[in-house]
Structure formats: C-alpha cells, structure tokens
A protein has these predicted regions:
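C-terminal peripheral helix-coil segments that are non-catalytic and often amphipathic
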Residues: 35-36, 40-43, 79, 83-91, ...
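Structural signal for membrane-spanning alpha-helices in multi-pass inner-membrane proteins
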Residues: 113-117
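Amphipathic alpha-helical packing segments from all-alpha helical-bundle domains
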Residues: 15-18, 47, 65-91, 101-105, ...
C-alpha cells in the first residue's frame, strides 16, 4: 500500500539518475556533474512530484522501524555518487582526507536537508533555484580549487 508507493518514489529518483547518467560526459568536472544531477533531480521533484507525497516519504523515514528507502546504500543513487566522487578524488578534484563514503554522505545529507526544508516551507520557493545556490556552497567544502 502506502509503503510501496513511498518506496517507489526512491525508485523513481533512481530511474531519473539512470537517465541523467548518459549526459554526465558533457561536463568537464565531477563537481559540475554533481551540480547537474542535483539540478535535474530537484527540477523533476518540483515539477512532477506532489509536495505531500515527498513530505510523507521524508516523514516515514523518520518514524519507520522498517525499510528506510532513502538510506538504502544499494540504491543506484549511492552507487553513482560513489563513482563520481571516487573519480573526483582520483583526478585531484576532491579532497582525499575524507573517504568517498563520507563525502557521499555529506552530499546526500545536503540534498535531504534542502528537500526537508522545501517541504516544511510548503514549497513556497523554487527548490531548483535554491539548490543552485546552496549545493555549490556545500560542495565547496569537498572541492580542491587549484585545479
């Protein structure tokens, strides 16, 4: 029932990432790839996911004792982020004093924080536009700037 619907939202997000992955080679840096993924996901959420459904997904992740779909490390989302961040580290673009998994967690926390805020503010601002300001600020902390 409701749990399956909420779980399918995570699946929908992952399907979007699979679709977007084909465009990643258009970007010169892994940083730009992460910003692109965030912007496209936030655009999809803002334009085609009901605020109520997203709020339910986020709230059930807080109270559930069962599956935490958003945190499932086997999701395509996490696999793609790990690959991009590992490549960024290997290419000298991202800092190496943090592990790939730590940086993936930081990125995912930043996205969830923005989604949560957008929900509790009842979508009163553009998620995509705010994300385009906030995510570069957050990602500046993992980026090496002298490349």
């Amino acid at each position: 029932g409701k749990d399956a619907l909420l779980g399918s939202l995570s699946f929908l997000f992952d399907e979007k990432y699979m679709e977007l992955e084909a465009q990643l080679s258009d970007f010169a840096t892994r940083y730009e790839q992460l910003i692109y993924l965030n912007q496209e996901l936030f655009s999809m959420i803002e334009n085609s996911i009901s605020l109520d459904l997203l709020a339910r997904l986020l709230s059930t992740q807080l109270i559930t004792k069962g599956e935490k779909h958003l945190l499932d490390r086997n999701r395509y989302y996490y696999k793609l982020l790990r690959r991009i961040i590992r490549e960024g580290q290997d290419g000298g673009e991202f800092r190496t004093d943090l592990s790939v998994n730590e940086m993936v967690k930081l990125y995912a926390i930043a996205e969830r924080a923005l989604l949560y805020d957008w929900c509790i503010c009842n979508g009163e601002y553009s998620l995509k536009t705010y994300g385009s300001t906030a995510m570069p600020i957050y990602l500046a902390q993992i980026r090496i700037w002298d490349i």
